[in-house]
A protein has these predicted regions:
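Primarily marks secretory-pathway-exposed extracellular/lumenal segments that are disulfide-
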Residues: 1-105, 447-452
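A sequence-level/structural motif corresponding to short, flexible coil/turn segments enriched
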Residues: 90-452
Length: 452
């Protein structure tokens, strides 16, 4: 072969071989390799870790998508990029109002949101049970009094499945229609003459019955027992179907909150007395108690009952379900070391998480709770983002203490002075704000960030 022609052929072959080699190299320079460079500049053969676009369209970004408009009903305080989902069709309403009736006789009121977006308020007027219906702005639509004594103790109210209302207080319970017209009144404790139930809370169960709890009440014929916690089952017509008592032999056992359990039973929270050192029961019984939680069947048969606490003072005040199938109990604690006059600076908020069997999973303590011997008012609610919020009375810094924690939201710790002492009730409203009532007849409607 002619030498010049041979050289040309060799040159062409070298070019062809070099190009083929270049085409078969991957991003890592490996001939025949399968590494690929992703949109973030990372070169490897693992396609499972390729970067992706976040909601802001940034490759490898870490933006949290959601509504960043604090005036929207679905505002997300954790969102870093507004994804256009903000719902501003519902106007966020906030207010603080005193709703004292003309002849107010009891400064503790309860409030619940109603299906029409307004509120139902329970209180005391001239010594008797009193209901007030308001619109969404807290302005009165109607108010009525009933022949049920209510000048002492706490009271509670719920909207019932038929659109009416059920009021419960220290003397008994009453049911009304949607306009507040009385349908029935149930006074006293069945088979216990001259005793009242001192109701603290009520629910309408999914089975259609009302369950009311309170105390302390001494069961008929139980002269060796102190006042016990009480559970009463009432049907829609106002007939008492079951009355049950719970607790020990010491004074002042009572329930303060009841909910339908995760499995459709009943869960009740309150306080149970215990001894003082060598004494089986204490003369200063309000200072020697445990948190008392009882789970029962639908006729009150005990499934389990537990106490939580030590040698001194713990009280259970409210309870809600948790997203993982357990319960969050709100209470208070004073480790007074047998000096009952030292609780002023020592009393703390106690948040107790338990499972369906009552096992103690976690305890959280917060300092700064004001101390009342009969129990500092406290109320607890779930939030729509999986967390919790409580209202109570702070030792200083204001008259209402609002605290939100858990779930996917940032913790809020806020003290305010709206004109009442906080802690009677709190619940989330349909615009993701909160409605709460206080001692002093002040109601407060906040936004989702607890501002008003």
């Amino acid at each position: 072969l002619n030498k010049p022609i041979y050289i040309i052929f060799c040159f062409i072959g070298l070019i062809f071989w070099s190009c083929e080699e270049e085409q078969n190299r991957d991003c890592a320079g490996v001939i025949g390799g399968n590494a690929i460079e992703d949109n973030c500049g990372t070169c490897d053969a693992d396609i499972t870790n390729d970067c992706i676009q976040d909601c802001a369209g940034i490759w490898g970004g870490e933006n949290i998508c959601g509504c960043t408009d604090s005036t929207a009903s679905n505002y997300d305080s954790n969102a870093t990029f507004d994804d256009g989902s903000c719902d501003t069709t519902n106007i966020i309403i906030t207010f603080s109002k005193n709703v004292s009736p003309e002849n107010d006789c009891g400064y503790d009121i309860d409030i619940k949101q109603t299906n029409d977006g307004g509120y139902i308020i329970a209180g005391c007027n001239d010594g008797y049970a009193w209901l007030m219906k308001s619109d969404m702005y807290g302005d009165k639509e109607w108010e009525k009094m009933y022949e049920l004594g209510d000048y002492w103790g706490n009271r509670t109210v719920i909207e019932t499945s038929d659109g009416g209302y059920l009021f419960a207080g220290w003397q008994g319970a009453l049911k009304t229609d949607q306009n507040g017209n009385e349908q029935w009144i149930q006074k006293g404790v069945q088979s216990n003459n001259n005793q009242y139930p001192y109701y603290e809370d009520v629910i309408e169960h999914s089975n259609g019955f009302f369950y009311l709890i309170g105390g302390p009440v001494t069961p008929r014929g139980a002269t060796g027992q102190g006042g016990q916690a009480i559970l009463v089952k009432i049907n829609q017509a106002g007939t008492v179907k079951k009355t049950k008592f719970y607790g020990g032999n010491c004074e002042d056992d009572l329930f303060r909150a009841i909910i339908e359990s995760n499995d459709g039973k009943l869960l009740m929270v309150g306080e149970k007395g215990h001894g003082n050192q060598s004494y089986p029961c204490s003369f200063n019984f309000r200072f020697y108690k445990d948190i008392y939680v009882v789970k029962t069947g639908l006729n009150g048969a005990i499934i389990w009952q537990n106490t939580y606490g030590g040698n001194y003072l713990e009280k259970g005040m409210d309870v809600v379900t948790t997203n993982d199938g357990g319960y969050m109990v709100l209470g208070q604690q004073c480790i007074h070391n047998y000096d009952i006059y030292s609780c002023g600076p020592k009393t703390k908020v106690l948040a107790l998480k338990i499972d369906e069997e009552g096992n103690n999973l976690e305890e959280t303590l917060l300092s700064g709770l004001y101390f009342f011997e009969a129990g500092t008012p406290m109320a607890l609610s779930n939030t729509n983002q999986g967390g919790f919020v409580f209202s109570t009375v702070p030792k200083n810094g204001g008259s209402v203490w609002l605290y939100r924690w858990g779930g996917t939201v940032q913790t809020i710790d806020k003290k305010i002075s709206p004109g009442g002492l906080g802690g009677e009730s709190i619940e989330q409203t349909n615009d993701h704000g909160f409605i709460l009532s206080t001692t002093g007849n002040t109601i407060i409607k906040t936004d989702s960030q607890l501002s008003y």
